[in-house]
């Protein structure tokens, strides 16, 4: 078989897949359209742009996000390697300078001798002749969406996603805010609100003017990324239990406020901060008006406003096998958020897994599914499980893991150790089958 792979989309999944295949002597043509067609959320021409957040979530090996990153490191993830090198203070999270991250990752991909970058709007998938990985993410172009529909049928789905505002540090009134962190591993800027201030702010959110959605879009928010105003409209208590929770955010007098708005460092220069959990669909003038009612942010300068966008994904259980391969078209694979995984690390890791299977396909080798004792294996099993009637976007979590003896174990790191051991054994077998050196 011709050892060349066409990858559509230079996002997190596409770049991970390209890097893995290229490192295994596969020629990769990586197609990217963002220099030709702009969209409402991406701001630069660099690959793998981080739109919603600047964090790859917790590094704790007691939770799924931390375990998945450990699995990715073991699989030689480019995304995690670059993220580790661009790390900024983020409490227990792996937070990065988002521009530095995308820039450095782009440099690695563009300078790889086995990767050719092609700036082109791909509108047709040659599913008969090309070995293709579709990793176009949530912002797939209309032309390609139509051709994907031709390929897989009318089984594509979507949800509404949103991003948060970013403000300049020098516009914050530090007489009214303080530094604190829930996990004592890092510091966030905390804007405290008393009960009256909180209620007034919540009312402002509820009554603020939003960008109008179409009728069929109004009830399909992804629950992990709901706009702050949507939470407020559902119940003010959701704000106190979620993004405005004051728990363990004590001020300099060891006092816990009624509620808190957290600001997280967004760049290596420590000049920009994003509003944690404040994804929004408010009109831009309304964002400025409402957010400037928060104590300490009265003169806040917003350098990037929150926006909302539609995320497309396919009905993977009906379309893909465990290899992330289209069941009816064996030379077409999918990876990333378009498969129904949700989140940066979930998308990136699916790119690695798709690339492993593409390498096996090229070499006519058969490999087994990843063990469901690993986060990546369990997540892949979830999105490709034919028993799922209606796929909803899924972040990694411990509930989907296969861990029969967890509750008989006294090891609080049971899930991590189980994942580590089973992945190590799997990689050993994989290297023997594929001749790789992972």
Swiss-Prot record:
It is found in: Cytoplasm. The keyword DNA damage does not apply. InterPro entries: FAD/NAD-bd_sf, MnmG-rel, MnmG_N, TrmFO. The keyword Calcium does not apply. It comes from the Bacteria. Keywords: Cytoplasm, FAD, Flavoprotein, Methyltransferase, NAD, NADP, Transferase, tRNA processing. It is an enzyme of class 2 (transferase). SUPFAM superfamilies: FAD/NAD(P)-binding domain. It catalyses: uridine(54) in tRNA + (6R)-5,10-methylene-5,6,7,8-tetrahydrofolate + NADH + H(+) = 5-methyluridine(54) in tRNA + (6S)-5,6,7,8-tetrahydrofolate + NAD(+); uridine(54) in tRNA + (6R)-5,10-methylene-5,6,7,8-tetrahydrofolate + NADPH + H(+) = 5-methyluridine(54) in tRNA + (6S)-5,6,7,8-tetrahydrofolate + NADP(+). FAD binds at residues 9-14. One of its GO terms (biological process) is tRNA methylation. GO terms for molecular function: flavin adenine dinucleotide binding; tRNA (uracil(54)-C5)-methyltransferase activity, 5,10-methylenetetrahydrofolate-dependent. Its EC number is 2.1.1.74. Pfam families: GIDA (PF01134). Gene3D superfamilies: FAD/NAD(P)-binding domain. Its cofactor is FAD. GO terms for cellular component: cytosol. Catalyzes the folate-dependent formation of 5-methyl-uridine at position 54 (M-5-U54) in all tRNAs. Belongs to the MnmG family. TrmFO subfamily. This is Methylenetetrahydrofolate--tRNA-(uracil-5-)-methyltransferase TrmFO 2.
